[in-house]
């Protein structure tokens, strides 16, 4: 059998192409490719070379449309024993190829060519083409005869034209030789034999039969030459005669041959005119051809020679003619019959050729798996031969089956598929189901393993270590679950042995172990966060920070690609990191010599690392690199140097594998089998590289640990900033973010601004003043326990509670000063987030707070004018005399504090003093605006009370607006707005309370460096809630006493020397006095006044027989009316009989009290009298002259 046969093969002239002398392989391929372009020579093109010596036997030669067809057999082939049966099997011409510079002796070339031609006795034309001859060779070439054709050095186009001319000459010579042979065969006849003819002596009957068959065989052979000469009509005429003679003589074998020739003549005659009728005719005739080949089977010589190969060859020719998808069923039946007949073939080479042709035809039909099956049969026949060339052939044939079995090497994939794998398409993040199914089909695993083992075996025999490594890698990577531990170790040894025979640094397209998947592309840390920069805005950082929490809306619709694809910016010269996970699901220790990121761009340098992975385990590693130039970067996978070979592991392949495992398309997930957790699909972001940027690095002076503060503690923290980049910082802005931003009291931003531009390597220190916030009740237990660490406070800040410093900074708009580049490309800015890791421990805790009151009686003295009060220093009047009551009213805020910590606190109370414009400039209060009370010490685990004195504030008037209650919602007055006076009064109350609270500060100190301030606002507010009326609202009536010194000089010097200047009273003298009654309301009050004088024992001194004080005037039953906000006086005189301490008390009963007075007094009945009593006034009576 012959390979690549078709029905038209009978019309093709075979020409042996032989290299003569030494020819470089590349030149030989070039010369051969030049010949292949002239496989068809039109008859019209050879008319100038054709000479008709006598009348041509090809009377129907189609000179206008006919052609001669050639098949160039490089290296020739041995003669076939079936050449007489089919003339196209003969080598009818020989062409020698010579390279003159390599073979300068043309005589030797001619001799070698003649010797080579002796092996082809059937050759009718012989030519030797000598290329690139020298000048001397050109002179000698003319003497060597017409068989040596010299091709002088020239351009390729000229050489091709020269070669075309020579091929036309060869075609004309062959045509003339065909005519000679046909004329001789018709006149003299010829003896034509095949191996089927008996070689034994023939009896007379067989001799007669042979003579009769000779004529029919001659006609068949003439028909073959007519067909080779391009005259299908003449060939068909001779074939018809041969068919008739062969049928009469029972020569079935030659009958089948003649019938085959007639079909070929029919197709050549109707070239390009294929239709259904033609197909039916060919099908019918070839069915007869196959039938007659089968009839020519001779049992006696079946063990030696058999026409079965021609029968199967005819079946293949018909199958090739009908091979298209519409007739697939018929073609498959023909091929199946041919494959079944292969078992009866005697020659193994015929069986090999048959399987090859069957595989080709199945592949042409699109039946790849059937084609792969017969390719494996071919490989088995090759592997039965124990030689290297057969192993190479087996390996090449098996490599053709890998596509059908889905085990193809990545090197054999088309460039288009590779681009689709690694290209950045809009749907590059998606994985399609059909692609996964095509890559992984678990029910074929056993067959895939067998094929890969056969490829591995053939590669080892062929001495191809790279192919052996590739096969072992694919077998181990994709089928490790089905391979025993010993088999896995064997494959690892095969990989190592193949690598030993390969040069160092060899790359293979097929990865082995480990399995590599993308774990994550870490986004920028807070140290290197990049912000887009708008050069048109000075505050380009505005809006760069997140404005609020993420809110999920299930009704929002968006593009999946837009949401899943991330944008990642790297910076030239700054190291970057990518996390990948490696899995070794096999039973041996895996040593990875190096692994690094694979970048399909020239602007990224990756850093290799070596890894050891134990058996059946996975490991997450960090791979790093440095971008080197601006532009996009693609990271499709990793480059791994393992088992002595460098391979590329693509993330997409492992993603498809894991998805296939999830859908049951592959046996096992290598990562799950190694104990790794299930990882969601990680999309590869779009990575771009920005130009060099400044890099600001921050660290807290004294350590980057948590800043431990007690509640209210104030501390200054210094943060050191350094420019670790290669570009200076020319712009910087500091802001705050996060919770508890009030904890940052001040930031010395001017220190940073003054250091700009901050050059590479330069540093600047930024002081930040912090104040610890109040720990909530939910955190009290945690802070209590953390505060117990006295020896070394190692408290941890609660996540999300500490504020952070945001530093937005940027370099110059252009690194090289190019204005065009400045306009087109603006380097981005950066945001540095410095978390202030503040751990607030509970310090002093409030137990309770209450308001205490105390009154100190005032001394009765001369007229108590305002200037007398103002004359006293502020330090002495921290607790002022109430001008409306005439005595000292004190309020104390008592705070009970507990110390649950392990440190000692000292508490100091500071009260802010009021600076009056009337004070003397030399007053010491000017230099000390705060008055400090003595310190209070609170030991650990103890409590203490701190008294904070409060001024007895009073409003100037008692008005009804203080007692106005909110009307019910349904009442008509509920819709009215409060009056302006009511709003004013309430606002005044709130202002006074806030003013009171703001004047008092409670500060603590612990040790040398720890100090702070307690937040007592809530405590004072709580304490004042129930007593706000008592503290702020004045009494309706206030009383006061004073001495009346009629005729006393008003001169200050005289007054200073008077014994009454300090309010002293002498006994046995009449002492004029007056009582002052002030109305603090906005309406007139009628009252009944009474005055009482008591001694130190509390007894009334003006009544009874034992009275010690005589009086003149009225002391009781005094009726008077006091105008609104005015004072009324009542004068009387006292005569003290006994020196000593006396107390004066005034009281009054208000007549016809209104609602405001009753609300202030809190009376329940409208008839109940309202009694007002004033505070006591002391009178110091000294002994006087009798």
UniProtKB/Swiss-Prot annotation:
Where, per the database record, does this protein carry Phosphoserine?
Answer: 971
Q: Where is the sequence biased in composition, kind Polar residues?
A: 779-792
**Disordered: annotated span:** 777-824, 964-984
Query: From the record, what ranges are coiled-coil?
Result: none
Instruction: Give one Pfam family, short name only.
Output: TRAPPC9-Trs120
Q: According to the lineage, what is the superkingdom?
A: Eukaryota
Query: Knockout consequence?
Result: Cytokinesis-defective and seedling-lethal phenotype.
How this chain assembles, per its entry, is: Part of the multisubunit TRAPP (transport protein particle) II complex composed of BET3, BET5, TRS20, TRS23, TRS31, TRS33, TRS65, TRS85, TRS120 and TRS130.
Q: What is this protein called?
A: Trafficking protein particle complex II-specific subunit 120 homolog
Give the classification, highest ranks. Eukaryota, Viridiplantae, Streptophyta, Embryophyta, Tracheophyta
Which gene name does the record give? TRS120
